Design a protein with these regions (language model features):
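Cap/insert and terminal regions of metallo-dependent hydrolase folds
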Residues: 159-232
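Active-site metal-binding motif and surrounding structural segment of the metallo-beta-lactamase
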Residues: 36-85
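Residues in the short beta-alpha loop(s) of Rossmann-like NAD(P)-binding domains
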Residues: 34, 88-90, 210-213
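Metallo-beta-lactamase
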Residues: 81-82, 86-139, 228-231
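Structural motif
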Residues: 27-29, 50-55, 149-153, 171-172, ...
Length: 232
């Protein structure tokens, strides 16, 4: 996989979804930072990295609940800078409010929008999607280039439509999938035919943010290019 996953579960699981990758410039790029991510990254050799980026998809607690802790750990223990990347100015404002309430000084981290990282070889675009009505126009996925691979990461989404223009042949798709719930997430049964059609174009489909990992694995067991993400 292009991404390494620290968690793959939904909001009520014990392993909230988060992933990361490393760059040739000794950067660690983390996608979302729930509390689980803060716990798990401490077991990685973080000293080898010179800088951390955290890409935020949206501000639900199971996606940014550990962000403030990670900022403090990077600053006070690792002595390394953290850049938090928000997909929009509105989301950046919400992140600032949340981190300030938690007692984080804005001087401890850099908070930018995606316009500040367009020069990064691994970044292409953020993708507005539909998820929670309470966060209308504040939920995003990302289009990334990792090790020369076209990567589409949906974040939490109830639709595939915004991501279709980015899914070129041979891409890797990491997609929010629910076995039972659906509604504000893609339901696996409803999306499976779309996933199968993607694989016919050489697209690798990885399922994440799952409410039932075992059930999802059984449902896609017969499809070689559709699978549940594995944990790092």
């Amino acid at each position: 996989m292009a991404l390494k996953f620290l968690g793959r579960g939904d909001g009520f699981s014990c392993e909230h979804t988060s992933a990361y990758f490393s760059t040739a410039n000794k950067e660690m790029v983390i996608i979302d930072c729930p509390v689980l991510t803060f716990k798990k990254v401490k077991n990685i050799e973080l000293e080898e990295y010179e800088k951390f980026y955290v890409l935020v998809t949206h501000t639900h607690g199971n996606h940014i609940g550990g962000l403030g802790l990670f900022v403090q750990y990077a600053l006070f223990v690792l002595k390394k800078p953290v850049t938090i990347v928000a997909p929009s100015k509105a989301v950046a404002g919400d992140i600032l409010t949340i981190l300030t309430i938690e007692g984080n000084d804005p001087a401890w981290y850099e908070l930018v929008t995606v316009s500040a990282i367009t020069d990064k070889e691994w970044f292409d675009d953020c993708i507005l999607t539909k998820h929670s009505p309470q966060l209308e126009n504040k939920c995003f996925g990302y289009h990334l280039i990792i090790d020369d691979t076209n990567v589409v990461y949906t974040g939490d989404t109830s639709t595939l439509q915004p991501f279709l223009p980015y899914l070129t042949d041979g891409s890797v798709l990491y997609v929010d999938t629910s076995v039972y719930y659906g509604m504000i997430h893609l339901k696996l049964k409803d999306a499976l035919n779309d996933f199968i059609s993607f694989t016919e174009r050489g697209i690798k489909v990885y399922l994440m943010h799952l409410d039932d990992v075992s059930a999802a694995e059984k449902m896609v067991a017969d499809y070689s290019n559709i699978e549940v993400v594995t944990l790092d």
